[in-house]
Structures are given as C-alpha cells and as structure tokens.
Design a protein with these regions (language model features):
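Active-site neighborhoods and metal-handling regions in enzymes and metal-associated proteins
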Residues: 1-250
Length: 250
C-alpha cells in the first residue's frame, strides 16, 4: 500500500533527510587513501547517534554495518570491513538510512578516492546526472515508469546498464515502502505519482553488463564482469510545486 504523507510528516522526513545528507558530507570529506570502510562506518554511526538519530541499516535483516560501503565492482550492500582499505583511484559508494524521531531519510553517493581514471569519473558523473533526470519526472500525474525510463535512457548512450534486481522504493516511517521505483520502465506505466508520496530514486549503474553475483557474505553484490559500478540516491517528496529533494547536501 502506498502511503500519502501530510505536509507535517514530510517535514519530519526532511529532518531525517538533512541528517542523512550531513552524514554523507562528513563521510565524503573522510574518504582518503589508507582508510578502511569499517572506519568510515564507525564515523557514520558516531555522527548519527550524536545528533539523536539511529543508523537504520545496522541490524536490518542482520546487516552488520551502519552504512553500505561498496568499492569499485561492488554495486550495493558492501559490508564495512577493517580489511577493506581504500586505494588511490578506487571509487566507493556510501549508502545510508537515518531514522530521526520515527521518520527516515535515505541517500547514497559514489565518490573517488583521490583522483580516479577518466572512465570511472565519467561513470560517476553520468550516474548522478541520471538520478536528476529521474527526479525531474517525479511530479504528480507522472508514473513510476516515467522515472525509470528517464534513468535508463540517460545512461544507455554511454554503453552503461542499470540493475534489474535492485530498485528504489517508497520511504517514510519504514525504510522500504511501496511503490518500487525501478531504474527502467515504460512511460505512462506503473503506479501514478501523487502529491504526498515520498520515494527514493537510486540509479545503480554498471560500466558494463548488469549481470551480478551476490558474495558469500550474503550481502555484497558485485558485477559479474568485474567492471566498476556507481550508485546515487535521493529521498524525494512529490509536491504540487515539483519534486522536493529531502537529502540535498550543502
């Protein structure tokens, strides 16, 4: 069932989204050569809890981390580890959900470790641009298919692909709510967007094919061809004045 949130509730989701965005801004500055993904995870948890929030990923269906930290060919759900040390030229996606006063915000960025190569840099740029192409379609009267079509159509000319097995979602008082928001679709198809809906649009884009493998830990998802992937996400409120991004970073 799709939940329609009141303007007061959306402000509470926005507060959670602000803490989510602030946490990502802090983490982006902390990303450097030689740091482990577990160190980033610990920094995120401390930051979130010190501001009255809860890192919702921690313990979710048994996930051990406060963030998902996915490096290079890991597309999503990378478990933070003391053994995963960032190297120059790596790319890392940092995905997190924050609960604040009973409401949730969800966002993800993919950033380079220092300078990365041109192919990786283009992948990051195109993935973020595809996110905003999808966001432009998040208006009352459009459909979920309009969003997915915009995302996929944006990345295809670069030879990239989008994951089919993992999608965006509604959000609010739960981390994952209806409707699902795929990164592919047919214009005019799928659930119709209404004012008061809150959704997460999150392109998961592969440099090569979208075939994936789940790691033995049961969480990390890597590209089958070993090529890099990128992941960007915002929490969006559907309003009569256009899409409102609730997780914008300063």
């Amino acid at each position: 069932m799709i939940t329609i949130y009141t303007s007061e509730e959306i402000e509470k989701i926005a507060a959670a989204g602000k803490l989510t965005a602030d946490t990502l801004s802090m983490l982006e500055k902390a990303v450097r050569l030689g740091i482990s993904t577990l160190e980033l995870d610990e920094m995120a948890e401390k930051f979130i809890r010190s501001r009255g929030g809860i890192p919702s990923c921690k313990g979710y269906e048994g996930f051990p981390g406060s963030i998902c930290a996915s490096v290079n060919d890991t597309v999503v759900h990378g478990i933070p580890s003391a053994r995963k040390i960032l190297k120059k030229g790596d790319i890392i996606s940092l995905d997190l959900v924050v609960e604040l006063n009973g409401y949730m915000g969800d966002s993800c960025i993919t950033v380079p470790v220092g300078h990365t190569n041109k192919k990786n840099a283009q992948l990051l740029k195109v993935t973020e641009e595809a996110l905003f192409a999808g966001i432009k379609q998040a208006v009352p009267g459009n459909t979920v298919g309009d969003i997915g079509h915009a995302v996929e159509s944006y990345v295809r000319p670069y030879g990239y692909d989008v994951l089919r097995d993992y999608v965006g979602h509604g959000i609010g008082i739960e981390m994952h709510e209806d409707p699902e928001i795929p990164n592919y679709g047919t214009p005019g198809h799928g659930p119709r967007l209404e004012e008061g809906m809150v959704i997460c649009i999150e392109p998961m884009v592969t440099m090569g094919r979208a075939d994936i493998i789940t790691l033995r830990d049961g969480w990390g998802v890597v590209t089958a061809d070993g090529l890099p992937a990128a992941h960007c996400e915002h929490t969006i409120a559907i309003t009569g004045n256009g899409p409102r991004i609730l997780t914008l970073r300063d």
